Amino acid sequence: MNKKRQFLLSAALATFMAANAQVTIHVDASNPGVKVSPNLYGIFFEDINHAADGGLYAELISNRSFEDDDKNIPTWKTSAQEGAKIQTQLINKGLLNKAQGKALQLTIAAKPAATASLINEGFWGINAVQGRTYKLSFWAKGSYKGGLKARLTNAKGDKVYAETSLNTKVGKKWTKYTAELTANANDAKAQFELVANGKGTIVLDVVSLFPPTFKNRENG
């Protein structure tokens, strides 16, 4: 027992002395090492807080392929004026291609006087810049009859920064639709809206909105 106590005391004393030991560092400023280029910068990068998607990658639509959750559609929401209805459902059959795991089906009952919208908030907002033109594209199929508009609005949806009517006739086969939106105001917290004024079903996938990209490279 005495030997055990002596060992524990010795260990504690050694730990205390090590923790309080003096350390001296000598720096020889007259003998520098390798010269570092003034153009070389270091930065921490990790795909959190939208450093990649919503950061270096220029895509402005968050969860554009509806793959982020098995049951819900994060960053997407719907809105309908009085007298209109819109329902959403994730589906996993009849998809665009083998790479896609899901698509979003919209069931719409609207009219010109009472519209229904699918809204994306982007990555903590979509940065609308006055005079900037954004390229919109998406894939769709279904059995929908009516008009569709694409918009950039403020977060409340009561200010329209850009709007275009889409020349769409949604049919049974997957078709890619494209358009451009040019913002008339600045708002770092804008949102994207797809506005419907007809009836039927639309299946959507790969909804994309890009600002001008480096060397105008398509898809970022």
Question: Can you say where each PLM-predicted feature lies in the sequence?
Answer:
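Bacterial Sec-dependent N-terminal signal peptides
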Residues: 1-24
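Extracellular and organelle-lumenal recognition/adhesion modules and their flexible linkers in secreted
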Residues: 22-220
